Amino acid sequence: MKWLVGLLPLCSYAVAQVHKDPTLDHHWNLWKKTYSKQYKEENEEVARRLIWEKNLKFVMLHNLEHSMGMHSYDLGMNHLGDMTGEEVISLMGSLRVPSQWQRNVTYRSNSNQKLPDSVDWREKGCVTEVKYQGSCGACWAFSAVGALEAQLKLKTGKLVSLSAQNLVDCSTEKYGNKGCNGGFMTTAFQYIIDNNGIDSEASYPYKAMNGKCRYDSKKRAATCSKYTELPFGSEDALKEAVANKGPVSVAIDASHYSFFLYRSGVYYEPSCTQNVNHGVLVVGYGNLNGKDYWLVKNSWGLNFGDQGYIRMARNSGNHCGIASYPSYPEI
């Protein structure tokens, strides 16, 4: 795996310089069992254990502060608890905002429209199950297919998981995408338009690695006629699009420990920037305990966050860049 090379110096340092906390042995073993963690060498396990202990301390202190009303969300030691923030983004982020970005904003707002206070497209059967991208930076592909899956459901009444692997393998150099090394949602939509379709997940399953393009038009599950980009940084436009059109692909800054260890509540990270690095899907919005939020579907499996979802702060100055690059496809 990509992180192993960078981990080698850390392994040597960990064995030579740092000692594990023996009082955490039971909980370490329990956590490994819970998430089926296995390590090839003792040095690797020691290094992972030390990262895990550091993350555990971070989680415990954060949750203590949460109990005192200092945070609007709490954290948990999920399956990513033995990784650093840099590793998580290196493996699972890899968003590639196209260079010389030329925004083609075609969205027309209806500012006089009364929008619902809350929306959740899961309740309308327009959102497929949470996926797990593994150690492949295909977040952009999962965000793109998630948005198109909803449009397919709205048009045909059928909810079908579409193939992220189709995008990883086929939406490549011409579109500026690099498969597991990153891509972008609008260029994925453009590929589907040019290709006259995308296969289903069932016919073209996810492999979490780059492969040869195997698109089969006979197994085409959906098409895309165009896509729409929203105005940069406008949370009002994003809210309107989510309410009226369906789930929207967005890009966010997900590089913080607080993000990948999020468990519940409304995520607000003061150090979050608008330098986006991860593609996700906004499937709704609402208010929880007086905090406005975006309901976001991630692609890090069910063990991430709240069953694979995170509520991110809304109306907080384009927090984490969530309204910087929104787009949605149409069939």
From Swiss-Prot:
GO terms for biological process: antigen processing and presentation of exogenous peptide antigen via MHC class II; proteolysis involved in protein catabolic process. The keyword Hydrolase applies. Keywords: Cytoplasmic vesicle, Disulfide bond, Glycoprotein, Hydrolase, Lysosome, Protease, Secreted, Signal, Thiol protease, Zymogen. Coiled coil: none annotated. InterPro entries: Papain-like_cys_pep_sf, Pept_asp_AS, Pept_cys_AS, Pept_his_AS, Peptidase_C1A, Peptidase_C1A_C, Peptidase_C1A_papain-like, Prot_inhib_I29. Gene3D superfamilies: Cysteine proteinases. The keyword Signal applies. GO terms for molecular function: cysteine-type endopeptidase activity. GO terms for cellular component: extracellular space; lysosome; phagocytic vesicle. Glycans are attached at residue 104. It is found in: Lysosome; Secreted; Cytoplasmic vesicle, Phagosome. Residues 17-114 form a propeptide. Its EC number is 3.4.22.27. It catalyses: Similar to cathepsin L, but with much less activity on Z-Phe-Arg-|-NHMec, and more activity on the Z-Val-Val-Arg-|-Xaa compound. Thiol protease. Key protease responsible for the removal of the invariant chain from MHC class II molecules and MHC class II antigen presentation. The bond-specificity of this proteinase is in part similar to the specificities of cathepsin L. Belongs to the peptidase C1 family. This is Cathepsin S. It comes from Canis lupus familiaris.
